[in-house]
């Protein structure tokens, strides 16, 4: 693709995303489906603005690559070892069972048995990009079903290697094309990558971080991710698997959070590009000529995978309320099918339109998942939140609460308990089904749902409430909810949880002045107790704590425009000197006056 064409394609992608995704979000069908529809609109079977779909689809896989790197950063080798049962137990069972059933059905549809085996394996895989995005949106990341879903996806990525090796064997060309020496060299190169990464990555990043130039650190992070992806691609393996391993190797390093911050903006844009490319690849010509076949295939694929996943979740011990979410989020075909089916086509395993039919089935199955998840969310909301005797009542029965608490993790629980102990009327919204079920057993009024949906907030009593307390785990959800409340419920007094200084700056920029940094207050309190244990008078230690809090908040406000700049470092040094001067100035006065306590802002 020429430079000018690439620029034109980039503009079209951005325009399609900006136009389609907000519209999809407004319709309540989710960003992923919006990207897919945008791809159909600008692709060769839509308005025809872009025709070179294969090249763009290959490039857009970088979105999945960046996503897997960030996921790897959130794990570590010991955590992976803990997940071994779910990865190699449930993951392997899902692939083998689904592939066997689907291959049998393809044979009944006049596929050669070799093509049916490849088709069954490809259809058994799920979309890593879509499933992880939806799990994040639905708050499944930290739930048991979310962890199991991740394990299944990880096994599917690992299964790429033997699946690709199987294609030439099934094509009957093992003697001509299948070289065991090349396979051994690939395994050796893979081992070298593991060992080299284990011992070289941290020293390299330590050297780069010592330069103090943020842009160089970002460039080094991009270099690592892209190099790992290209290396694995050259070996004929999954690019996403390579970057996932690189992330795991750095998961225990001191640079984990900085790496994640450097990659995150690129991940979001490239994931959007990936979904647009998938939409562009939808062959509407095959869909029109084989409409009934494709429609039946999509339904059968989704139903078989959901049944398999639901049964495995039941055997594994997942709560009944979480099984449907787990089964539906992995029910689609995946991006790996495009790679596997292309390889099989080059080996002439498929006949006629068979490959095109399978790819259309995979693409359409990906489009069903957001709608399926939305329907299951509504069903779960009514089942979990609706009163048993009268289903006609709204899902959230507290129509006039004083306070709405969003999120019922450890942070939110403390706040809710304090409010309830003081006879305040509260409504708690939580999107982790397991947490909802558990807390209801203890008598808490907790309701299931995604608080970033305006209708749920309205039914929860946001129009009558005085305050909303936001305790979401994800900073993106917090900021989205803040914007939502400011737009639709401007009367609400917003109080929020900030995980650190960066999020605190974002809240201040958004106009939220009442927030609590979760580790800051507890750290200050422990610091005060430490001063007392070292012999400082309790009153003097309390004043030191209050001065520190006041100065830190002032510095936080002053540094809003430069919260990601090196200015913070010099300002922090000035603040430390200023704090020392305050303490020295007041030391003598505090020794004479040890009664009474200061109020602070």
From Swiss-Prot:
Database matches in Gene3D superfamilies: 1.20.1530.20, NAD(P)-binding Rossmann-like Domain
Entry membrane topology: Multi-pass membrane protein
Keywords tagged on the record: Antiport, Cell inner membrane, Cell membrane, Ion transport, Membrane, Potassium, Potassium transport, Transmembrane, Transmembrane helix, Transport
Pfam family name, one: TrkA_N
Entry's localization field: Cell inner membrane
Claim: Flavoprotein is one of the keywords in the record: no
Source organism, top-level taxon: Bacteria
Major location (coarse): membrane
Location of the RCK N-terminal domain: 400-519
One example GO MF annotation: glutathione-regulated potassium exporter activity
Quaternary structure, from the entry: Interacts with the regulatory subunit KefG.
Biological role stated in the UniProt entry: Pore-forming subunit of a potassium efflux system that confers protection against electrophiles. Catalyzes K(+)/H(+) antiport.
Entry protein name: Glutathione-regulated potassium-efflux system protein KefB
Organism: Salmonella newport (strain SL254)
Gene from which the chain derives: kefB
